[in-house]
């Protein structure tokens, strides 16, 4: 485990107002303050894809599949990203956008979860296709093998002919900032199933740019969300942060 990153996590996250609030209220966690969809100013802003809800309104994390781990995951993640790298990350904010929102094109990187419930319409599929082809990078997280068929089917409509392929440990994305030497500690936080990594490459060529990376049987944002609570072992949270940071650095430098 990287002791430097682990120490940084403790220093940055446990001294934050959010962490103090969490300790005060225990399991009755209060929603942290967050600014949403601020005008683009050139800095990296965490962009989460919003899609059809399962009921309710607002940003309730239990009401909408797209909002799982929101907003604590991205708030914690951007703090760590800003501390350990030179990425100009925008803190205390998040962009929550639909795929057919023109604001998507202000972002190089976007994040989507629970793709077993994802059913983009024609407009959203067309926009995602254009965005990926113009240099966008999509991170797919928080889903398991039961969701795979729907995800694979939807991506076949978004990018006809594109193939989801295993992404090996030797791929540059796993050495873009931190050197990931094993996947042994990368598992689903609750089922314990080993996470596997799947991607889509430009022209289906592994030598070309990776335009999408999916954490199958994984949920790295769950570790981000609770990393200031001691809910998961520090080494597992550490690995989740390293993966996320590598994804960002890879996408910004390719």
Task: Tell where the protein language model's regions lie, with residue ranges.
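Short alpha-beta junction capping motif
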Residues: 46, 104, 109-150
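Hydrophobic/aromatic-lined pockets within catalytic cores
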Residues: 136, 159-160, 252
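Surface-exposed patches in mature extracellular/periplasmic domains of secreted proteins
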Residues: 85-98, 140-144, 162-170
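Bacterial N-terminal signal peptides
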Residues: 6-16
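Aromatic-Pro/Gly-enriched surface loop or interdomain linker
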Residues: 20-109, 115-116, 219-254
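An acidic, glycine-rich "communication" segment
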Residues: 24-30, 54-58, 145-226, 236-241, ...
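Extracytoplasmic/secreted envelope proteins and their assembly/folding machinery
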Residues: 74-78, 125, 129, 152, ...
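Positively charged n-region of N-terminal signal peptides that target proteins for export
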Residues: 1-4
